[in-house]
Regions:
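Glycoside hydrolase catalytic-domain context in secreted enzymes
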Residues: 25-767, 777-788, 795, 799
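Bacterial N-terminal signal peptides that target proteins for export
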Residues: 1-12
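Surface-exposed, short loops/turns at beta-strand junctions within beta-sandwich domains
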Residues: 773-774
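Bacterial N-terminal signal peptides
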Residues: 10-20
């Protein structure tokens, strides 16, 4: 479609026609030298009720809708929309819509254009759960800076990110979009994301307005089912689910998205305590709140409002300023006229929206250079960072020698760790085992390995690599593992690529028994797809090493993608079991948006890598790890369950009144995870010395310190993690371990480094029931460890 020709309001068309064309009014709100609040008040005073409601309304323009742009122009001219969800990659459409808003409405208020820019725009990075496993907020800030630059060059000025929700139940599909399960670590990533998106000034070129979502408690949906209700008590709410949002507000985020859930029976979009008392009253948030998709109208479905008008009044009064997609706010005119809804409530919501529009700079810079996008996306430095992010986000879960002996029994959870209960005996420090020369771990791939079989449906699959919520990401930009592997091995080696099976498999036609007759349900497709065991077995038998690329489909992650069983899909498990029996070393690379409970794979494979959904540089980043060009340093930010039945599972649980193992285990399995929070292997090994606490002195806080030594034979990065436990809390029980600090430490072979953490009130405190930060006197345990559930606690008493 070619851009429409804009009508001229003067000249050849005549003064008569000019008088019919709306012209933006000159006024103080156009003066960029004035304080933002003065501009807001001047503009607000000029607006009609209909224009005000229009600013509180967001609509969608998606791919394909550009065929009828006049429909959008007509709506914009009425002033009945203030923002759009924009999915069109061509800036000409966005500029045309913006020009209509500015030149063909009475007040010329520009539009906000938002989209879900979650883990990259065109340059797609690992999903947020993967990025979090880098334990590097600076890297996340860099990635979001690139995403913002690319998005702004397309015409977006607002992203619905970052997600601040905790990931405590891997059945929930949106675990993929989170930064993990820990409120402290998530807070760091949320703040880093806000800085990456908005910079120091969201009006600067290449910046977009950030949006903290989903406010709040959305991820605690009962049963891990998306959109379900939540049951979060206030004390837990304040100390676990709310801190990442608070960190985002403190970092300067300009918008917040209310969530789909209803906590304690009150839908978030209509929760006055959440959106007004807490967000604005306690935290001082000055931006605006937008609902999630049709979230205001869903207040009726929850049963919290009798009809759409009631939902609109309840949500707007609660502090939900903008309505995404549903149209209940358009029904408010009569209720404003008869005084049911005070105009002051509407004015306050509009005031917040206008303030963000002024701060974002779109009054001064409303348009986008149509040529900027092509010059900005997929820049070499952006792609290079995407590759580095892959290598740093993958987590090496297992890496053992290949002994060619069949495994017996089931794998023990958490290999290489010592389960810890600070109330019981003190465990020994944890050290990553170092293989003997005769039992070299299978990774990195040895130089004498020339014949490699890459088996599995993810090996040469492009779309699966970029995952869910990809904004403008394209499969054509992806370099697959197969491509990168063949490039790395070159002519001197042999790489056999065998799909083996489909990702999802296929569902056979169902058979039912009716009156003694078997009836074939023809509405279900017959068995189809790929399942070629002979080819896979043959390739494995002819190779020195097998790499199996397995996982879950990207469409089974993200929104509305809950799972009852977090296992491999289709016939992948059968494929793995068959190949594992061939008698060759097997390295499994898992592609997923969540941890998967795969006990037989962890038992039989020599090595396992969690690759997540790695982005466009999936192949090169993984090859860097497989061949040892990069020593893995990723650490889990989510507990990896041994079985779906353990969910929800998270490291910072409570001690219970009966902490002895006999009272907290299941009858049929251990409560211990397969891998704990903070876990991850490297190609070297580290040891931790005995920790000690240095008392406070001379105005300096107390400190805890230890010495970490690289006991391996190559340089590596360790993530030293500080954990704390408070033994007595008058406000309520506290978790038996909480992360309160970490340091990434790079060490050469044999090198030692002293690691020190300050023991401040920020480390020891928590949010009290009154919403204020509280630090109690009394006994604490502190320890520095490579992961949760391990380490050597040191007693500390705060006077």
């Amino acid at each position: 479609m070619t851009p429409r020709s804009f009508r001229l309001c003067a000249g050849a068309l005549g003064l008569a026609l000019a008088s019919l064309c709306p012209v933006a009014q000159a006024g103080d709100y156009h003066d960029a030298s004035l304080p933002v609040d003065e501009r807001v008040e001047d503009l607000l005073a000029r607006m009609t009720v209909d224009e005000k409601i229009g600013q509180l309304t967001q609509r969608l323009i998606d791919v394909g809708m550009e065929k009828d742009m006049e429909k959008f122009f007509s709506v914009i001219r009425t002033g009945s929309v203030g923002a759009y969800i924009l999915m069109l990659e061509d800036a000409q459409y966005r500029n045309a819509m913006q020009k209509t808003a500015i030149e063909e409405t009475r007040l010329g208020i520009p539009l906000l254009f938002g989209a879900d820019v979650i883990h990259g725009h065109r340059t797609v990075f690992p999903l947020p759960l993967g990025l979090a496993c880098t334990w590097d907020p600076d890297l996340v800030e860099q990635a979001q800076t690139i995403a913002a630059r690319e998005a702004r060059s397309m015409g977006l000025n607002w992203t619905f990110a970052p997600m601040c929700d905790l990931a405590r139940d891997s059945r929930w599909g949106r675990v993929a979009e989170t930064f993990g399960e820990d409120p402290y670590l998530n807070s760091l990533y949320v703040a880093a994301s806000v800085r990456g998106f908005q910079g120091t000034n969201p009006a600067d070129p290449g910046r977009v307005v950030a949006c903290l979502k989903h406010f709040a408690g959305y991820s605690a949906s009962v049963g891990g089912r998306d959109y379900n209700h939540t049951e979060i008590p206030p004390f837990i709410f304040r100390n676990f689910h709310l801190p990442p949002f608070h960190a985002g507000v403190n970092a300067g985020a300009l918008t917040v998205m209310s969530s789909f859930n209803a906590n304690d029976g009150i839908p978030a979009a209509a929760d006055h305590w959440l959106l007004t008392d807490l967000l604005r009253g306690e935290w001082g948030f000055k931006g605006f709140v937008v609902s999630d998709w049709e979230g205001v109208q869903e207040v009726v479905d929850w049963g919290y409002a009798p009809d759409d008008v009631g939902a609109a009044i309840a949500s707007l009064t609660a502090g939900n300023d903008m309505e995404m997609m549903s149209k209940t706010f358009t029904l408010l005119g009569p209720k404003i006229a008869d005084g049911t809804l005070p105009i002051s409530v509407v004015d306050e919501a509009v005031r917040r929206v206008l303030r963000v529009k002024f701060l974002s700079g779109i009054f001064e810079q409303p348009y986008t250079d149509p040529e900027a996008y092509a010059k900005t996306i997929l820049a070499p430095e952006s792609v290079a960072l995407a590759r580095a992010a892959v290598a740093r986000s993958v987590v090496l879960l297992k890496n053992e020698p290949f002994l060619n002996t069949p495994p017996t029994g089931t794998p023990s959870p958490t290999p290489g760790t010592v389960p810890q209960n600070p109330s019981a005996s003190t465990p020994a420090p944890t050290a990553t085992p170092k293989p003997t020369p005769k039992q070299r771990a299978i990774l990195p791939i040895a130089s004498d390995v020339k014949r490699i079989a890459l088996i599995g449906p993810f090996g040469d699959e492009k779309r699966e690599m970029i995952g869910c919520w990809i904004s403008q990401g394209k499969a054509k930009d992806v370099v697959t593992l197969a491509t990168a592997l063949k490039s790395r091995v070159g002519a001197d080696g042999d790489v056999k690529i065998v799909q083996g099976c489909d990702i999802n498999g296929s569902q056979p036609r169902t058979k039912t028994l009716t009156d003694g007759t078997v009836v074939l349900d023809k509405s279900v497709a017959p068995p189809m797809g790929v399942f070629d065991l002979p080819a896979a077995v043959r390739a494995a038998g002819e190779s020195d090493l097998v790499i199996m690329a397995l996982g879950e489909p990207w469409s089974w992650t993200g929104e509305n993608a809950s799972r009852a069983r977090i296992t491999l899909t289709g016939r992948q498990q059968e494929l793995f079991d068959t190949i594992a029996a061939v008698g060759k070393p097997v390295v499994v690379v898992l592609f997923s948006g969540r941890p998967l409970a795969l006990p037989s794979i962890f038992a039989k494979a020599s090595a396992v890598i969690a690759a997540w959904q790695p982005g466009i540089q999936a192949g090169p980043g993984l090859v860097d790890i497989l061949f040892g060009d990069v020593n893995p340093s990723g650490r889990l930010t989510i507990t990896w369950p041994a079985d779906t039945g353990q969910l929800p599972i998270y490291y910072n649980r409570y001690n219970t009144g009966r902490p002895d193992k006999g009272f907290i285990d299941y009858r049929d399995m251990s409560r211990e995870p397969m891998f704990p929070f903070g876990y991850g292997l490297t190609y070297t090994s580290f040891s931790y010395g005995k920790a000690e606490v240095i008392p406070a002195a001379n105005g300096k806080p107390a400190q805890i310190r230890t010495t970490i030594t690289n006991t391996g034979d190559r340089e590596g990065t360790e993530v030293a993690q500080l954990y704390v436990r408070q033994f007595f809390c008058p406000e309520g029980a506290r978790p038996y371990q909480e992360l309160r600090g970490f340091q990434r430490i790079k060490l050469r072979p044999g090198e030692k480094k002293e690691v020190t953490f300050d023991v401040t009130d920020e480390v020891l405190g928590y949010v009290g029931r009154d919403g204020k930060w509280r630090v109690d006197a009394g006994k604490f345990s502190l320890w520095i460890a490579p992961q949760a559930n391990s380490g050597d606690p040191v007693s500390f008493t705060r006077p």
